Design a protein with these regions (language model features):
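Non-catalytic helical/linker scaffolds that mediate oligomerization, partner binding
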Residues: 1-485
Length: 485
């Protein structure tokens, strides 16, 4: 069974992606590998993808896009600034940044900003205030001592930057993700539903089933979360840029609201950024970091993400092991009365959601060891995950891709099994496999949600003891198109 029910996403660099390293992370509790397109070459991606697939077909791969971001241009060497100094800013991606003039990648940067605005560079390390504006440049005052490196992030809190959702590099990377059959695309700086639909249009044109995770990194994304969740397949609370774009004291509350909305939408939510930041250089986390992980789980997140901790940190395997141990304990300690109650829409006639809720409720009344579902698209398993049962969901998947698409869903252990039998015989084959692998015992009671046929909607819930289900398999017939139970 699962080491923990909360899933772990680990960022991996092409500079450290050998098979042994990935295997260690997987065995420590990693479920998804994140590839950052800002920091790797195409050759590096090739090696990373091949090595992940060599370790296990159960590890999902998530690719980041850059999205509508603004960066400074290159500068020959780091530039020191002192508080009170004046510096010009221009929007010219072809101009080199100098001490007197900082150039940024967005041509209309000057026109989008006003006097009195704040500009934060390099995740807020350098703060500037706009004190004058001309047609060609902004004159800014330096608000703190800092050193500026090359191609650093630029954030403008409270200002909408009118950049297109996708860069040309993003489009090329999406086509590459389709070619390599990547599992998830995490799109940066999602502001509204159209930003998601821009990616969906490309995927649909190539008949791709890649799932889209919307990274919420600014106030506009927070404000439009409901419409974003209508079209995205999940959400990442990207606390790094979000903590720059909105006041940092609001981050915990925003995190809680976004997780809740993901659960109500029955789509996975990921909490990211600085979960174990000190473990980049230290073998042990701070107490605050341990509490941060636990609180995200108490909020009922599906997944947690490690960034620099595993991409370039000194203790990557230890970081995953630490997160696994903290998650497992937090899952035991969380209070059931704080579970998010998902109302059933009486007008929707959503049989899948109704049966999923009853299956999870049954685990609190009966000694059910696990809930089993056969899964073609993963929808039933995601419904079960949303209700946050105490025991794992064993999703027996007809397709490998579905198995990996469930790698972000809380409490779901997805298992790929080709459709060797029809209808209920697939269920019996799954039970025999689970017994053989030691995941279940003959005396275990299980719940089973299915439609009886791959690709059709869930239509019944059965609760039975494993050995009884198999013993009477050829004797009992349900009124479900005469498929054997």
């Amino acid at each position: 069974m699962l080491l923990k029910q909360t899933k772990i996403v680990a960022s991996i660099s092409d500079r450290r992606c050998d098979v042994d390293f990935i295997k260690q992370l997987f065995e420590a509790g990693m479920n998804v590998v994140r590839m950052n397109t800002a920091h790797a070459s195409r050759e590096g991606f090739e090696a990373l993808i091949a090595n992940v697939r060599a370790v296990s077909n159960r590890i999902a791969i998530l690719m980041d896009t850059k999205g509508p971001e603004v960066r400074t241009t290159a500068n020959a060497e780091p530039i020191p600034y002192k508080i009170g100094e004046k510096v010009k800013i221009v929007g010219n991606p072809d101009l080199e940044t100098t001490r007197e003039c900082i150039a940024v990648s967005y041509p209309n940067f000057v026109s989008d900003l006003n006097i009195g605005g704040t500009i934060l560079i390099d995740d807020g390390d350098l703060e500037l205030e706009v004190i004058d504006k001309t047609d060609g440049y902004l004159l800014c005052e330096v608000k703190n001592d800092a050193t500026l490196g090359s191609r650093k992030s630029v954030n403008v809190p409270g200002v909408r930057i009118n950049l297109p959702s996708l860069t040309e590099k993003d489009r090329n990377n999406i086509l590459y993700a389709i070619e390599k059959d990547i599992d998830f695309i995490a799109h940066s700086f999602v502001r509204n539903r159209q930003d998601v639909l821009d990616i969906r249009e490309i995927l649909d044109a190539h008949n791709s089933d890649i799932k889209i995770i919307a990274k919420i990194e600014n106030q506009e994304g927070v404000d439009n979360i409901d419409e974003i969740l209508e079209v995205a397949d999940g959400v990442m609370v990207a606390r790094g840029d979000l903590g720059i774009e909105v006041p940092q004291e609001r981050i915990p509350g925003i995190q809680r609201v976004l997780i809740r909305k993901c659960i109500l939408a029955k789509k996975p939510g990921i909490v990211a950024t600085q979960m174990l930041h000190t473990m980049i250089n230290n073998p042990r986390p701070t107490r605050a970091e341990v509490t941060d992980i636990a609180n995200a789980i108490y909020y009922r997140t599906d997944a947690l993400m490690l960034s620099g901790e595993t991409a370039y940190g000194k203790y990557p395997v230890e970081a995953v092991k630490t997160m696994t141990k903290v998650a497992a304990q937090a899952e035991k300690d969380k209070l059931e009365e704080n579970d998010i109650r998902i109302p059933l829409d009486e007008n929707s006639n959503d049989v899948t959601a109704f049966l999923a809720k009853q299956a999870v409720k049954a685990t609190s009344k009966l000694k059910i060891r696990a809930i089993i579902t056969d899964s073609y698209s993963g929808r039933t398993a995601r419904n079960l995950a949303a209700f946050r049962g105490k025991y794992p969901v064993l999703a027996i998947c007809y397709k490998e891709k579905t198995m990996r698409h469930l790698a972000l869903s809380y409490g779901v252990e997805a298992i790929y099994m080709p459709e060797l039998a029809n209808g209920q015989q697939y269920y019996f084959a799954a039970l025999r496999r689970l017994l053989k692998e030691g995941r279940l015992q003959p005396s275990d009671m299980v719940g089973y949600l299915s439609s009886g046929k791959a690709g059709t909607k869930t239509s019944f819930l059965e609760i039975n003891v494993v050995e009884d289900a198999l013993k009477h398999a050829e004797e009992t017939v349900l009124p479900n198109n005469n498929r054997y139970l």
